[in-house]
Amino acid sequence: METLAQHRHARSSAQKVRLVADLIRGKKVSQALDILTYTNKKAAVFVKKVLESAIANAEHNDGADIDDLKVAKIFVDEGPSMKRIMPRAKGRADRILKRTSHITVVVSDR
């Protein structure tokens, strides 16, 4: 059975989070947690928290055995962007986009 966990509006761009998500797609959850623990990226912290949440959901809601779980699906969608202004020389201004992302992890025992 499949169990889902999400982190919406994570303060990192979808492009950066997808680099980390690609590392654990299809792996067993124990191996995926080890990979994320030693991945030196800010996005790895976000993905690890969502994966741990999905594992807890599977254990609590579905009574799944942790040893049988694997990362069935993981995908990252773009969230809303916060628009900010950066003052520049000679009275000009640039628009800065502070991007967010929605991280979804699905674990399965099949």
From Swiss-Prot:
<comment type="function">
    <text>The globular domain of the protein is located near the polypeptide exit tunnel on the outside of the subunit, while an extended beta-hairpin is found that lines the wall of the exit tunnel in the center of the 70S ribosome.</text>
</comment>
<comment type="subunit">
    <text>Part of the 50S ribosomal subunit.</text>
</comment>
<dbReference type="GO" id="GO:0022625">
    <property type="term" value="C:cytosolic large ribosomal subunit"/>
</dbReference>
<keyword id="KW-0689">Ribosomal protein</keyword>
<dbReference type="InterPro" id="IPR005727">
    <property type="entry name" value="Ribosomal_uL22_bac/chlpt-type"/>
</dbReference>
<dbReference type="Pfam" id="PF00237">
    <property type="entry name" value="Ribosomal_L22"/>
</dbReference>
<dbReference type="InterPro" id="IPR001063">
    <property type="entry name" value="Ribosomal_uL22"/>
</dbReference>
<protein>
    <recommendedName>
        <fullName>Large ribosomal subunit protein uL22</fullName>
    </recommendedName>
</protein>
<keyword id="KW-0699">rRNA-binding</keyword>
<keyword id="KW-0687">Ribonucleoprotein</keyword>
<dbReference type="InterPro" id="IPR036394">
    <property type="entry name" value="Ribosomal_uL22_sf"/>
</dbReference>
<comment type="function">
    <text>This protein binds specifically to 23S rRNA; its binding is stimulated by other ribosomal proteins, e.g. L4, L17, and L20. It is important during the early stages of 50S assembly. It makes multiple contacts with different domains of the 23S rRNA in the assembled 50S subunit and ribosome.</text>
</comment>
<dbReference type="InterPro" id="IPR047867">
    <property type="entry name" value="Ribosomal_uL22_bac/org-type"/>
</dbReference>
<keyword id="KW-0694">RNA-binding</keyword>
<comment type="similarity">
    <text>Belongs to the universal ribosomal protein uL22 family.</text>
</comment>
<dbReference type="GO" id="GO:0006412">
    <property type="term" value="P:translation"/>
</dbReference>
<dbReference type="GO" id="GO:0019843">
    <property type="term" value="F:rRNA binding"/>
</dbReference>
<dbReference type="GO" id="GO:0003735">
    <property type="term" value="F:structural constituent of ribosome"/>
</dbReference>
<dbReference type="InterPro" id="IPR018260">
    <property type="entry name" value="Ribosomal_uL22_CS"/>
</dbReference>
